[in-house]
């Protein structure tokens, strides 16, 4: 945390400052570079895994940008009790990717068509978002149950689950498996090229180059794919010039079993939002305790929930505040929430043009896989850092070991608990839910006094891992 505190003292534009237009524009573009790839990637991954049409995937990407713009506008402007009033940027929540793929794949194997799959996934996301809205009013109680150990396990399980998706894309994706080209030299070569470029730029001293490493790696991989004839532009031919958000475009359907899974992920992601908003307040030189802090926290989580309601209605995956932008604030020294207005407007404008979303659907799976395999592994590492924030004593070790064992075990064979009632099985067949719920249960059951010496001597915080 010392680095964050130090960065806060070097702000060029503080929270309520109004930078000149050209400086606000530069700051906005810098933030967009940090979030653009992670923002559109979830829709691309879900679209590829469920083999959605190019038009549907492009629409998901466009709506992700528009919803992110609306959410960012709400967060930075703070209307009444809604919004943090900080430079909190909204983007698609990676926590839902594996859940959406699992639920959608199950429906697909049962013979459901694309429109019904989308209506169901977005329907349960719409209803589930109200859980986040309600959670904003009971944050002190949730924080007692969902501790850093619990939230760290959830983040770790998300990363570990996504690695499988990343490595499949690395080999060419699900389409390549169907065509028999999975893991050929072209796919592996392009994926490896992207991975090497991303690693190389992440070793640079320049924060700007490190931040843009993934985008640069994707560009290099895309150019290589063009040269190898791996890019197909046919999906862009019939796209309209402008896309207008169409509420419940695919209809509305609801499954209680799916809601249990999605609702659990929503509740577990609340603490992630709390951490992100706290970090944003810290780097913006605002209080991280007291009445102002609690008010911003409540407003930020409330906005998270309302924005996910809007996002699900127009056709986007659920949203959350993005941690990457805290690094941009530190790097640029610009914490002005008025820069957030510029970012919000730019995102909405970009989302209105489906050709932009359509272009991203032409990126070969191997290109995405090369970057995403590393990114998802870093998510897992972030989970480990959260787990050891307050040390890893014997009580926490038992919670982590049991949760990790059951969560990973379920990912290896999801049918192990099939004997359970359907309403319970639908929860525990998902590794993220299985690991997260186990952690919550053990955190409640195991006595708080069961705390002996640190199992990892000398490690008392995540900072000591640096």
Swiss-Prot record:
Outcome reported for the amino acid change (mutating residue 385 to K): Highly active
Effect the entry attributes to changing residue 421 to C: Strong decrease in activity
Region forming the signal peptide: none
Residue numbers marked as site, Important for purine uptake and affinity: 430, 432
Reactions performed catalytically: xanthine(in) + H(+)(in) = xanthine(out) + H(+)(out)
Result of altering residue 31 to Q: Increase of activity
The name this protein goes by in its record: Xanthine permease XanQ
Organism for this UniProt entry: Escherichia coli (strain K12)
The gene coding this protein: xanQ
């Amino acid at each position: 945390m010392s680095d964050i505190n130090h960065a806060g003292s070097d702000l060029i534009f503080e929270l309520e400052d109004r930078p000149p237009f050209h400086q606000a524009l530069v700051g906005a573009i810098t933030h967009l570079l940090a979030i653009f790839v992670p923002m559109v990637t979830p829709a691309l991954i879900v679209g590829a895994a469920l083999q959605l049409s190019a038009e549907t995937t492009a629409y998901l990407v466009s709506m992700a940008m528009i919803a992110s713009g609306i959410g960012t506008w709400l967060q930075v402007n703070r209307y009444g009790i809604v919004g943090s009033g900080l430079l909190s940027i909204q983007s698609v929540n990676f926590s839902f990717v594996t859940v959406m793929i699992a639920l959608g794949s199950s429906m697909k194997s049962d013979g459901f068509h694309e429109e019904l799959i989308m209506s169901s996934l977005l329907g349960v996301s719409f209803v589930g978002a109200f859980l986040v809205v309600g959670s904003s009013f009971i944050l002190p109680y949730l924080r007692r149950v969902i501790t850093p150990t619990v939230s760290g396990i959830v983040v770790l399980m998300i990363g570990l689950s996504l690695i499988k998706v990343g490595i499949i894309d690395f080999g060419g994706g699900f389409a390549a498996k169907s065509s028999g080209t999975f893991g050929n030299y072209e796919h592996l070569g392009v994926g490896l090229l992207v991975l090497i470029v991303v690693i190389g730029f992440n070793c640079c001293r320049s924060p700007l180059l490190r931040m843009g490493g993934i985008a640069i790696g994707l560009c290099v991989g895309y150019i290589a794919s063009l040269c190898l004839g791996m890019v197909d532009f046919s999906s862009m031919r019939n796209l309209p010039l402008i896309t207008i958000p169409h509420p419940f475009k695919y209809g509305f359907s609801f499954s209680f079993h799916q809601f249990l899974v999605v609702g659990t992920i929503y509740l577990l992601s609340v603490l992630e939002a709390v951490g992100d908003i706290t970090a944003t307040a810290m780097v913006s030189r605002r209080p991280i305790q007291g009445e102002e802090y609690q008010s911003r926290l409540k407003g930020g989580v409330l906005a998270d929930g309302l924005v996910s309601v809007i996002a699900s209605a127009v056709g986007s995956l659920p949203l959350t505040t993005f941690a990457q932008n805290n690094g941009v604030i530190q790097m640029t020294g610009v914490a002005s929430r008025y820069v957030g207005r510029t970012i919000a407007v730019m995102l909405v404008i970009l989302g209105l043009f489906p050709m932009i979303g359509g272009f991203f659907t032409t990126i070969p799976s191997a290109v995405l896989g090369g970057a995403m395999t590393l990114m998802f592994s870093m998510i897992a590492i972030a989970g480990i850092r959260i787990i050891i924030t307050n040390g890893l004593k014997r009580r926490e070790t038992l919670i982590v070991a049991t949760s990790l064992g059951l969560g990973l075990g379920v990912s290896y064979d999801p049918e192990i608990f099939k004997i359970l009632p359907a309403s319970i099985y639908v929860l525990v067949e998902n590794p993220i839910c299985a690991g997260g719920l186990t952690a919550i249960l053990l955190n409640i059951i195991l006595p708080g006094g069961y705390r002996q010496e640190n199992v990892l001597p000398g490690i008392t915080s995540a900072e000591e891992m640096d």
